[in-house]
Amino acid sequence: KGDVKVVADGICAGINSGELTCLLGANGVGKSTLLRTLSAFQPKLGGNIFIEGKEIGDYTDKQLSRVISVVLTEKCDIRNMSVVELIGLGRSPYTGFWGTLSKEDKTVVDKSIALVGIPHLAHRMVHTLSDGERQKVMIAKALAQETPVIYLDEPTAFLDFPSKVEMMQLLHQLSRQTDKTIFLSTHDLELALQI
């Protein structure tokens, strides 16, 4: 915001499918900025970002929505929508203009709900969920998007410690079970060491 401050230079890194990778750093050091850059939400200052062998800038927005899904830190105040409807929005890169879910889309949504372990929440209204339940719903939405890469910005920010550990274990399990690349940021060293 204003002056450009270089916090790192000459970084070369790769993350494989089926891996959960944690970006660890104190609050305010640029973790969220890096995630926004990696997901093309904001322009990069320099260098190259490749996903599946293709420069991120060479993807159209629609193509990128089939490659990267993002779960942000901000709590969404969603009213008048059920859990299954919200998770169904993860299918938007594959649906037509009206967003009508096909039988296959509904199957993907149901599978995502099962993977995250929230079938009992499927017909609840989103605004009635606890923070931990809501975060699981957002992860299920990212899974329903069927991208090879999932970015999560401080996914445990509003959770108590036992829920944080449960969330990290879930993400670790999902990375292996789905063979997705899961990349998350956190400032919590103790939590990062749990994985």
Regions found by a protein language model. Give the residues of each.
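Conserved ABC ATPase signature
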Residues: T100, M125-L129, E133
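Conserved ABC transporter NBD signature motif
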Residues: G47-E55, L64
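The feature captures the beta-strand-to-loop junction immediately N-terminal to the Walker
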Residues: L24-A26
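Helix-to-loop junction immediately C-terminal to a conserved catalytic motif
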Residues: S39
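Catalytic Walker B motif of ABC-type/P-loop ATPase nucleotide-binding domains
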Residues: I150-E154
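Conserved ABC ATPase "signature" region
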Residues: G88, K103-L121, E146
